[in-house]
Amino acid sequence: MRHLQRLYDDLVAASQNKPGLLGKLFGKKDQAPVRGLYFWGGVGRGKTYLVDTFFEALPFKEKTRTHFHRFMKRVHEEMKTLGGEKNPLTIIARRFSDESRVICFDEFFVSDITDAMILGTLMEELFKNGVTLVATSNIVPDGLYKDGLQRARFLPAIALIKQNTEIVNVDSGVDYRLRHLEQAELFHFPLDEAAQESLRKSSRALTPESTAGVETD
């Protein structure tokens, strides 16, 4: 939790030093982003829970919480609308930075060559615009897109992640989903609404890292 507390404090401090109206008008928005966090480790280690709790606690509205692949789907959709632009990723990154100071990605995982080829430029532009990245992943940054086609072109994205986030391994040897089952009520009678809610609660606890959608607040 100390990593999240550090980031929270840094973001709050940075919010008190945001550029004023003149700075925005004259394009002085570019600033070094607050260094984010990249949580990686096995399934069931509580990564998503930590980030969800952190996201809800942030005391400002310019924030986004989304599954990584949903985010990339939006990027590709916006690129289609900017087909005539010379630097579409610069424009897209500016749009994201206008919406959010912090972007929280769940399940950061790269398998698509198209995503791999554009992520370096996209991340460079996001960080240039002061966006802070918080991500969860099952894979350490150096293992992303391993053995992928033209992986050398993806390496700048890995370097940017390592430069702009604190890498935190959350493997503790404890699967918190299984711990929940050990404490859960396994026999339900009668089969009423309370029993149904108990089952729903156990289901949510078992699959927290696959239930997140897009949240902007």
Regions found by a protein language model. Give the residues of each.
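Phosphate-binding P-loop
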Residues: 7-20, 24-34
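Post-Walker A helix-loop "phosphate-sensing" segment adjacent to the P-loop in P-loop NTPases
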Residues: 55-64
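Conserved lysine of the Walker
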Residues: 47
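Short glycine-rich substrate-engagement loop in P-loop NTPases that contacts/grips substrate
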Residues: 63-100
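Hydrophobic anchor at the beta1->P-loop junction of P-loop NTPases
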Residues: 39
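Walker A (P-loop) phosphate-binding loop of P-loop NTPases
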Residues: 44
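Hydrophobic positions on the alpha1 helix immediately C-terminal to the Walker A/P-loop
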Residues: 50, 54, 67
